[in-house]
Amino acid sequence: MAKRSTLAGLAAALLSSTAVLAADLAAPAPVPAPAEPCKATLIGPAFNGVIKANPNPTCFAAGPLGDIYVGGALTGYGYVQSNPFSNFATPAAPNERDRSARFDFSNLQGWIQKPEGMFQFFVQGGGYAIPGLGVANVGSIAQTDLLFTPLPVAFGKIQFTDQWSLQGGRMPTLIGSEAPFTFQNLNINRGLLFAQENVINQGVQLNWADGPWSVSVAGTDGFFAGDITWFTGSVAYKIDDSNTVGVNGGLNLGSQNVFARSARYQFATPVFQQNSGIFNINYTYSNGPWIVTPYFQFTNVEADPRAGIFNSASTYGGALLAAYSFTDNFSLAGRVEYEEQSGVRGSGTTSLLYGAGSNAFSFTITPTFTWDRYFLRVEYAHVELGGITRGSLADGTLGSGFGRDGNKTSQDRYMVETGITF
């Protein structure tokens, strides 16, 4: 009996010491779950409006490269307008005119991207139109050829850490509140203030993001000039899930005489804007059915005889963009803008708007129907000019406004666009 008691005591002591030892040992680390395939945050393109990015983009595994995503936009548009710029002509496309009516494709584009890992890339190519208010609009094939070529966006990116990255190539600008292509925006037409902003840049860009802050700086060629002389930057702060405030801008640190280049070069690179500086401040509210974005813009170009600019000029402008979604399939978007140029009407040769002392107001409304990846939208836009310089056909001079003689001060545009994004 005593022997059995001794053995039982030893067994109990052994079990107790084993339990204590087990308690002191760290629990084995759980095996990490493999990353879910094809669920990365995409690099682009940005969708800023009621036409939304595909929540399930096409994706395929590419071996050591990782997951590759592809998408695109196939859309067409048409419009009728009053008082076209009938006197518009460019040697770069001698058969192109600003017509009173046009039907064309607005996007025949596709993109491919690798948005994960240290080495990433984004490439977007195809045909496009970038219609804008208050400016001449030519055919989509001509725009694709003369603006940013059939390869408007193509850049590589190195993601050093979760916060830091460096990218280079052809990239969307850091400036402004509207994106280049129609499907990316609340409205079909780009606004008046958009005309002062460079759209696609070639250069190098450094990015930092941490918590609510995101900061980017870039050295670029500005208005697709080919020479890296522009410095641009953007700072955004996300106040909460619904509110974001930001500032962005840039300036040309050099001087370019665009007039000394070909007509083809001048089409994408306007001399006054290329040699200017610009500053924007914007705020965005996005919550439930509402999207609201007001922003203010200031631009300035100094006199520079080397660049063919003999008078300085500035513009001041503000815009309010908004959209309300009544249902998952129907929304209403709108935009109002006002912009003016400094100076006295008829003085100087520097025209950032419609000549010195001119001003412009625009109103746009865009009902939009969406179903899955398909959309259909119509648009009405009105532009009203003030302070234009008037001409006389009898004297062989043209005004700086709309119409055959440049003396018209208003333009109405009725537009429709439809297609799919995928």
Q: Which residues does each PLM region occupy?
A:
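Glycine- and aromatic-enriched membrane insertion/assembly motifs of diderm outer-membrane
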Residues: 96-130, 325, 330
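Residues on the lipid-exposed face of transmembrane beta-strands in outer-membrane beta-barrel proteins
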Residues: 72, 101, 105, 110-114, ...
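Outer-membrane beta-barrel pore domains
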Residues: 94-97, 134, 141-145, 245-249, ...
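Transmembrane beta-barrel strands of outer-membrane/channel proteins
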Residues: 42, 72-80, 123-127, 168-170, ...
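Surface-exposed coil loops of outer-membrane beta-barrel proteins
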Residues: 79-81, 85-100, 131-153, 161-240, ...
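N-terminal periplasmic/intermembrane-space "pro-region" immediately following the signal or transit peptide
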Residues: 1-88, 417, 422
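Residues that define the transmembrane beta-barrel architecture of outer-membrane proteins
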Residues: 66, 101-106, 147-152, 198-202, ...
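Outer-membrane beta-barrel channels and translocator barrels
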Residues: 65, 115-119, 161-163, 173, ...
